[in-house]
Structures are given as structure tokens and as C-alpha cells.
UniProtKB/Swiss-Prot annotation:
Organism field: Desulfotalea psychrophila (strain LSv54 / DSM 12343)
EC number: 6.1.1.7
Record InterPro entries: aa-tRNA-synth_II/BPL/LPL (IPR045864), Ala-tRNA-lgiase_IIc (IPR002318), Ala-tRNA-ligase_IIc_anticod-bd (IPR018162), Ala-tRNA-synth_IIc_core (IPR018165), Ala-tRNA-synth_IIc_N (IPR018164), Ala-tRNA_ligase (IPR050058), Ala_tRNA_ligase_euk/bac (IPR023033), DHHA1_dom (IPR003156)
A cellular component term, taken from the record's GO annotations: cytosol
Domain remark text: Consists of three domains; the N-terminal catalytic domain, the editing domain and the C-terminal C-Ala domain. The editing domain removes incorrectly charged amino acids, while the C-Ala domain, along with tRNA(Ala), serves as a bridge to cooperatively bring together the editing and aminoacylation centers thus stimulating deacylation of misacylated tRNAs.
GO biological process: alanyl-tRNA aminoacylation; negative regulation of DNA-templated transcription
UniProt protein name: Alanine--tRNA ligase
Gene Ontology molecular function, alphabetical: alanine-tRNA ligase activity; aminoacyl-tRNA deacylase activity; ATP binding; tRNA binding; zinc ion binding
Needed cofactors: Zn(2+)
Gene3D superfamilies attached to this UniProt entry: 2.40.30.130, 3.10.310.40, 3.30.54.20, 6.10.250.550, Bira Bifunctional Protein, Domain 2 (3.30.930.10), Threonyl-trna Synthetase, Chain A, domain 2 (3.30.980.10)
Keywords linked to the UniProt accession: Aminoacyl-tRNA synthetase, ATP-binding, Cytoplasm, Ligase, Metal-binding, Nucleotide-binding, Protein biosynthesis, RNA-binding, tRNA-binding, Zinc
Broad enzyme group: ligase
PANTHER family: ALANINE--TRNA LIGASE, CYTOPLASMIC, ALANYL-TRNA SYNTHETASE
Entry-linked Pfam families: DHHA1, tRNA-synt_2c, tRNA_SAD
Amino acid sequence: MKGNEIRSRFLEYFKGNGHTVAESSSLVPKDDPTLLFTNAGMVQFKRVFMGDDKRGYVRAVTSQKCVRAGGKHNDLENVGYTARHHTFFEMLGNFSFGDYFKEEAIRLAWNFLTVELGLPAEKMWVSVFEDDDEAFALWEKVEDLPKGRIVRLGEKDNFWAMGDTGPCGPCSEIHIDQGVGSSPCDNPNCAVGCDCDRFLELWNLVFMQFNRAEDGSLTALPRPSIDTGMGLERVAAVLQGKFNNYDSDLFAPIIAVLEDISGVKYGAAADTDTAIRVIADHARATSFLVADGVLPSNEGRGYVLRRIMRRAVRYGKKLGLEKPFMDRVTKAVCAEMQNAYPQLVATAALLEKVVNNEEERFRETLEHGLVQLDEKISQLLTSGGDAVIDGPFIFKLYDTFGFPFDIVRDIALERGVGFDEAGFATAMAEQRAKSRASRKGEGVKLHDEGVKALADAGKKAEFLGYEGLEADSVVEGLLSEQGSGVEKLVAGEKGRVFVAATPFYAEAGGQMGDRGSVRWQGGQASVYATQAEGTGLILHDLLVEEGELSLGLEVTLQVDDEERKATASNHSATHLLQAALISVLGDHVKQSGSLVGPERLRFDFTNFSQLTAAEIAQVETLVNEQIRNNAVIATDVLSKQEAIAGGATALFGEKYDDDVRVVSMGDYSRELCGGTHVGATGEIGLFVILSESGIAAGVRRIEALTGRAALAYVQGRLSTGNELADLLSCKSGDLVPKVESLLTAVKEGEKRVAQLAGQLASSGLDDLLNNALTVAGIKVVVAEVPLENAKALRELGDKVRDNLESGIAVIGGAVGGKVALLAIVTKDLVDRIQAGRIVSEVSGIVGGKGGGRPDMAQAGGTMPDKLSEAIASVPAIIEAML
């Protein structure tokens, strides 16, 4: 059975058993700072299991994209060397949120494996937690599970916990006996629980029934849940009679491409087999990480991706691949998996650019780094001491050549030397500490005690700002400027206020929070920021200008009308801008960030090259065309699945509720967005791009203006153009050719001036030579000459040298408020006196220094008023040196 069929059967089977098919979440977890990547099917349901979130269903089934590389769950160093380790894999899982429990989970899993997939029951084994008598008894009731096939194991193997505290529970694993000889094993008592692959774990059923307190005690959860996981790659290999995941059909097309481009046959040799497996795996991880918005960088998720990509390139060298090849391999990944994951098609162009750019950049430094590493290892192996690559050296390779630690480790293991991982980590930590220190002072959002108290009290605000800009409400919470709860704020004090309902939009989704005022009988305050805290809290940062603001007071909240309109205009323009960028550059364009305020907008997006002037103009034109179309901007609340299916654009990594707000601008733009917008595109008025720049590898930034700000900018540019036209006595439309003509004339004039200066300096050559002095029997030419530039002095010096058969010359002049000196000694005299010594001595008088060859030397100085004195001293200086 093919891997794609297994995936489809799994989803359809559980759908037929009352489960909702939930789409795979992004590899970038939205609300879990403890994880670099989504590494299990339950990650997207973590808040559901903890009771902090609810879904519109109690049964779910997924085929979840997972990455285990970096952080606690890191399989990177094992990839390629074992039959089962991957950086990227798919986890098939079914989930129950307080619905069915152990008996149903066991029944569903057993039936799928033995009936749907046809795996032989006689080869199956089951493990349960040693104290889970309930699960043991339920498995004993499974009629076609052979007797004696249930094994009790300890907490290490069969008890699962989300963390040190929180939901946890025993688990039951289903294993298949692949037979003697299926996996190397030296244990004569090999059985379920052995580290070899003979008794291969297929499926893990987690019974979340307890909550673990900080003291380690367990209490029963009111609504026990189910979380299961089965690796698609693993079950595909088993069904296809393979003992290695990489031998299944999921990898075959990728390996075939590698065989084609390298000329190396898979299965020919152990070392090249390892390289092929590494590249095949890493190409899958690269393809899906880029598709989910991760780009190579030097920190966080981007650094893990860079490590994966560069490790693949390095293993490519083992296959003789000296030219870029990863693009062809990732294309094979996309071709194989695009039906199950259509986003691979949408991001194909971006993936191609990312892969080619990263591989080319790394290849530029790879050879240099490999040479240094090889020299280091050779030195260690011949030194007779401990053959350990020191941490600072490994860090130097990382910092200078972009060598991830993994590459150094792999090569060290291959060459039989040690590596100082702790020393490398220390050097890395020191660098990060310096980086953090340099960023000291950047703003940090604090969740203080007052905010926590409001959240714990279940406070939530109703947002009324879509319908109007003014609303009456009641003060339900007050915080001091320091963040603690207070009863009142008086005139002159800053603080934060929470009300039951507000028209103020809280900063979110890149849109700045509203500003405005709060009024009450006998007082008022100015709101200078609005922020969202926790779940549902909207806090107004304000300054009390008059009166006393206290709890329970009835107030009127008024959003600044002009600022809201300007912000809405800029926000709507960012939607049009993204659509225009996709139209001009391609579907790889994805939003990477934005900042929308009343003054201007900033939009960050993925693209691996600078936009040309023509592309910028085209984008600007497209946006303004949509503004002139004056399309109605409509908002609808739809299910997330319905919105995405309808073509709505979602922000990578953003977590959305099951019901989402969709903002549509005619047929041109359709995005998931909770921000505020104008009523029709025509209200934007005008759109002008101020700048386009790069902010990171593969990320560009556009800053732009709309409405009145854009008009003022254009008027300012026109005014400046008119002033320049008046100054140059031409029409505004002729400014460019007029300026080009003037620049050409200036350059020609400068060239002519330089020529004349050279001629003027050279014209006195005969006079210089005829007026030469004699010092100790040697002809000495000494002169102070007018100079246009330093080049004129060198040209004069060349002519003096060519015409001075035997002698010394020292020439000086003032250029741009500084002194330029030149000394020449003919070759027959350099054994007696050197030009460098002469010019060094003379330049000291004019506050400078210099040097050069024995026959010619130059110097500079900062005291042109001392030049005559310096020139006059030359004969005495030469006489003293002879």
C-alpha cells in the first residue's frame, strides 16, 4: 500500500467514525514559546487539552507535518545513520477531547491496523503502563490479539506528560514483530522495549486522565482525553515489507533524482547511502519549512533551517556533487507531496530562490572552512596529544564561514577526533550576550500583576470599534503607571483603564492601537495607546488631564476620528499592496510583518531580490488602479476552512479562531484580518511608495503613504522640482536631461582643469632643473609648486625623475588645506640616501608622516602654513644624512 493511500485511508476511516478532519497546522507553533517547531500531532490541540481553548468538535483526526531538529526534540545528528530518524515526518493521529476514552481508542486503533491496513494480528504486541490495569484488561478483551502479547513497562516507556506539570497519563503502544534478523541486536532476550527495531512501535495511544501538580501528585481530570500518534513513514515501510523508512515509496522518487544527478546508486555503499538518506530527508524538511514561512537566518528557526540545508550540501560532496543540486531535489519533494499539501505549489518559486541563494552562499565559504578544519584535524592527529577540536575554533568556523556545529561534529566523528561542544556553546552564549546587551533598552511588553488580576477575574471587553468611534461604558479596572491595581487616578497621573465595552482598537496584527479621549462628568483623560493583554482584555493607556477617574465611573470613550481614518486607509492599502506584489513578483510573496499607523505604513514580505524601479512603479500603479476602482470593502465572518477554501490569504504562523473575519476588496484582495478599514478603496485616495529595502535574507520592506500624507509628499516633490527648474531655467519635464547635461559639463570641466594644472606644473620643469642646488656634490631639486590635486604632484614627479640623470628631488604643494610631499632619489644614489628617510624627516615639520620605496616616497601633512619652512630645510636635512 502506497504512503499517500495510507494517509487518505487513515483520515477517511476516522472521519467515518465521527471525527472532524482538521488540517495540519503550521510547522511554526503560534502560541507555544516552548517549541521551535510543531513536533507532534497534539501541538495544535495543546490549549484544548489544557482547557484554555475550545473547538466546535470533540473528535478530531489529522495528518500533521512535524519537524524534530533543534531544541529538546532533536533527531538531526541521527538522520541518515538509522532506519527511523527524520527531521521531517508526518504523524497520523486521532484525538478525543473529553468524548471517548480508552476502550474506544483501543478498538479504533486495532481495527484500523488489522482490518483497514490488513496487518497480521499474530505479529502484534502491545505495551501498557505497569500500573494501568484498566488498559491491560481492555487489551485482553481484544479477541484476535494472541494471548501473552501484552507487556507492562515503566514510566520511561509508557507514561506521557505534557511537561513537569499539567495534563498527563499512561499510554499504550502497539508494536509489530518484524522477525529475527530484521534488525541488528545483541540482546539474547530481545523483546518489546528493546532498543532495536525488531519489535517496532507503530502507534502510541496516550490516555490523558491526570493532572500533575508541582509536588508531583496526580489528580484525575474531570474529562479524560485521547491523543494518539503513528508515523506515516514507519507504517508505510512496514506495509511495503521494508525494514528501513527510506526504502519506502515516500522517499523513492527523491532518491531516484539523487541517483540521477550524482550517478551514485542507492545501495551501492554504506557511506553514500547515508549521504543520500541525509539529503532526501533534509530536502523534505527544507521544502516544508520554507512553505510554512521559515527562511534561513542566524537565529531561532531560521538557523535550524540553515543547519539542515548546509548539512545536506556538505553530504552532497560525498556524492561528488560540486555544483548546486538542492533545487532539483526539493522540486522532487514538491512533485511527490503537492497533492496532500497544496501549499508546496504556492511556495515553489520562493523555495527555488531560497535553496539556490543559500546553497550558493554556503559554497562560497565551504571550501575555505573545510581546508581550515582539515588542517586542524591533521595537526591534532600528528601532535600526540588529545585529539579534540577546541570550542573557540569551532565557533570561529561558524562565525567566519557559516559552518553549523553539526557539520564539524559529523566530520570529527568521521575522522576519529573529539570536539568541544561545551566550549562552542560557551562562545556562542558569549556572542548572544553581547548581542542582547547591544539591544538593551528595546521595549518589552510587561504582563504585570494588575493585568493578571483582571485576567484572573475573567474580565473581557466588547469591541465596538467596527460600528462607531464613540461609546459609553463603565470603568471596571484601573492600573497605575507601574501596573498595580488602584481605586482611582487623579489629574496629572498616567495609568491604564479597562472598560466593559470600547470603540478603541487595541494594537494587533501590525495595526497600532487607537488614540483619543475618555470623558466623564467633571473630568477627562487623553488616551495615547491601546493594547490587548491576555485573552479579551483591552487596556487604554491614558493621562488624566482633569478631574478624578475612579472605579465604577460612567465614561464616554471617543476615538480620534482623523487618526482612525488615516490608519484605516493605510491598513486597507497594505492589503492592496500585498495583492499587487503577488501579481508583479509571484505567489512566493508572503507577508512577514507590518506596521500600520496614521502617519504611514510598513509592509515586510518574502522576496530574494531587490525590486527594480520598474517593478516598484508597476506595484504602485496597480494599487492606485484599485483605489480608482472604488471597490466596496466588505467584511464577512466565516469558518476558517470556508475562508481559506474561498481564496482568503492568511498570515503564516498566525493562529486563527475557528470562525474568522474576512476582508474583501472587490475581486482583487481577500484576507483574514481583524483590523479596521475604510468603506471603499476610493477612500484611500492616493498611494505612494517611499522606499524599498532589504531587512534580512529573503525579506524586503516597503514603506508607503496614503491619502493626505501621500498628497503632501507628492506636492513637496513637485514644489522641489519646480524650484530646481526655475534655478536651471528649464521646464520641469526637462529637468533630467538638463541635470545630465550639467553633470557631463562639470566632469569635462574637471578633467580639463586637471589637464591644465598638470601642464602648468610641467611647464616649470626646466626651471626646476636649471635652478637645482648642489649639496655634497649631488644635484638637489627643491621646489614648492601650486597644485590642483595630488595626482598633479605625482605626474610632475614622474617627469622630474625621467629628466634627472643623477640627483635628489623634493617637491611639495598644498592641496585642499593639506600638504602633499614627494621625494625622488635616482637609483645610483639609493645606497647612500633613501627617499623614504628624506620625506619622513621633511613631513614632520608640516605635522605629517610618510614613507615609501628608497627611490620614491610620498608624505602628507596637516600644516600648510609650515610648507615653505619645510621646503627650505631640505638641503640641510639631505646634507646631514649624507
